[in-house]
Amino acid sequence: ASELRVNETASLRLTDIDSKRMMVRITQGKGGKDRYSILSQRVLEQLRQYWHKYRPREWLFEGAKKNDHITIHSIQLMFYAAKKRAGIRKPASVHTLRHSFATHLIEAGTSLHHVQMLLGHRSPVTTTVYLHVSRLNLAQVISPLDRTDKPIG
């Protein structure tokens, strides 16, 4: 669920992963709101492998301190290390993954309302920023006038 904010990812509990409904529960997201997000089958498989390897108990991503989750800083350090190993030089942060996820949803035709819900935005205006980032091919847009058999005029 790469649409999560870094603090939301850090504070995920094992019980927040609902593999039957393919959902992730985000508790106390920005503004203190709870919400649900989608869980990809590919991510679920990776989470299962991760669980079998590390056997976390309460927090999905356990921290160095006992009974605590991973820190935001640790996630950021892992991201930058992975970016370096991959040879990616373009500026990017953990938050870039969230922006990319939203942009891909919009490019795939997901409604702005659904993207807003997934990202946990209070206002649809906040979500519209992804419309400007999206590089939709205008040549692929079909005019509503071409969708009818009735003559015009």
Language-model regions: role of each:
Residues A1, R98-R122, V129:
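C-terminal catalytic core of tyrosine-transesterase DNA break-rejoin enzymes
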Residues L4-Q49, V125:
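Conserved tyrosine-mediated DNA breakage-rejoining catalytic core shared by Y-recombinases
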Residues L12-D16, Q116-R122, L131-H132, D146:
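A short, basic/aromatic helix-end/turn motif that makes direct DNA contacts
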Residues L14, S40, L44, I75, ...:
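ATP/adenylate-binding site constellation spanning eukaryotic-like Ser/Thr protein kinases
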Residues Q28, V125-P144:
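Catalytic-site neighborhood detector that most strongly recognizes the C-terminal catalytic loop/helix
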Residues G29-R48, W59-Y80:
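C-terminal catalytic core of Y-nucleophile DNA break-rejoin enzymes
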Residues D146-G153:
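C-terminal secondary-structure termini that scaffold catalytic or DNA-interacting sites
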